[in-house]
Amino acid sequence: MILLTFHTRRLVSHAYCGLKPASQKKSIALEMTRPSSNLADFREAFAKAKHIAVITGAGVSAESGVPTFRGAGGYWRKWQAQHLATPEAFARNPSRVWEFYHYRREVMLTKNPNPAHLAIAECETRLRKQGRKLVVITQNIDELHRKAGSRNLFDIHGSLFKTRCTSCGRVKENYKSPICPALDGKGAPESDVQDAKIPVEQLPRCEENGCSGLLRPNVVWFGETLDSNLLGEVEKELETCDLCVVVGTSSVVYPAAMFAPQVAARGVPVAEFNMENTPATTSFTFHFHGPCGTTLPPALARHETELIS
């Protein structure tokens, strides 16, 4: 992870490298147009596309029962997620932050992909057999795309099920439940629950020989930058795709909020599937309103021009 200094050539042209909510950023100037909701027209663009980039956010997982931590109900205990998901919060109170992430991990172990995740994964597999390409660029850290079967996957904000040692830097998959004995039964989200105040030495620790450093979730926190190599790969996909599909994103967290509008700016069709309009909606070719699990499967289903294999 490169901090502070990384800038891509085009996609992050305004230094939107750090993970930040839109309230801390200037708004993007968008062309004010009304996107189409004509599914037949989208399907025509879909049939012609050879390289599809699918960008997903929290909305695609909401139908799996995953808490989004947005809006008036977006609290864990009395804290908003953006106040817990920071390096400063972890430095001040690693026990509280680990309780929060332990809760999220335990919730996710009970969740399954919904029809939107499955439609994306099935489409990727089907198009691969036709010599076409579909990649998924997700802001989600829940791994539901991977669980659904997606393979060309960029988890740009990391994963709940990977840890990083604050001492040696080792990143490792971790699906333990609980992740450590001291967190067993902890992390309840209700506002009247008190912090467990777990001693730091009892929190998740690195198991590398001679290390035993404190582990942290391997996710990108607010104020941190995305991995430069990963962001460079994402940039290449977005610069070469000929169709972009945006699913369940709020378009308010940077740098991901810039991805689809800049694809649209080079004349590539962009289709948004969401429960509501976003700050970027008017820059897109298509907008399909409704639950992603309902609207997306027919949009990505086999087209009549596709060869059956």
Swiss-Prot record:
Positions annotated as active site in the UniProt record: 157
One annotated GO biological process: protein desuccinylation
CDD domains recorded: SIRT5_Af1_CobB
Main location: mitochondrion
Chain residues that bind substrate: 101, 104
Catalytic reaction list: N(6)-malonyl-L-lysyl-[protein] + NAD(+) + H2O = 2''-O-malonyl-ADP-D-ribose + nicotinamide + L-lysyl-[protein]; N(6)-succinyl-L-lysyl-[protein] + NAD(+) + H2O = 2''-O-succinyl-ADP-D-ribose + nicotinamide + L-lysyl-[protein]; N(6)-glutaryl-L-lysyl-[protein] + NAD(+) + H2O = 2''-O-glutaryl-ADP-D-ribose + nicotinamide + L-lysyl-[protein]
Subcellular location: Mitochondrion; Cytoplasm, Cytosol; Nucleus
Pfam family, one: SIR2
Task of the protein: NAD-dependent lysine demalonylase, desuccinylase and deglutarylase that specifically removes malonyl, succinyl and glutaryl groups on target proteins. Has weak NAD-dependent protein deacetylase activity; however this activity may not be physiologically relevant in vivo.
Protein name as it appears in the record: NAD-dependent protein deacylase sirtuin-5A, mitochondrial
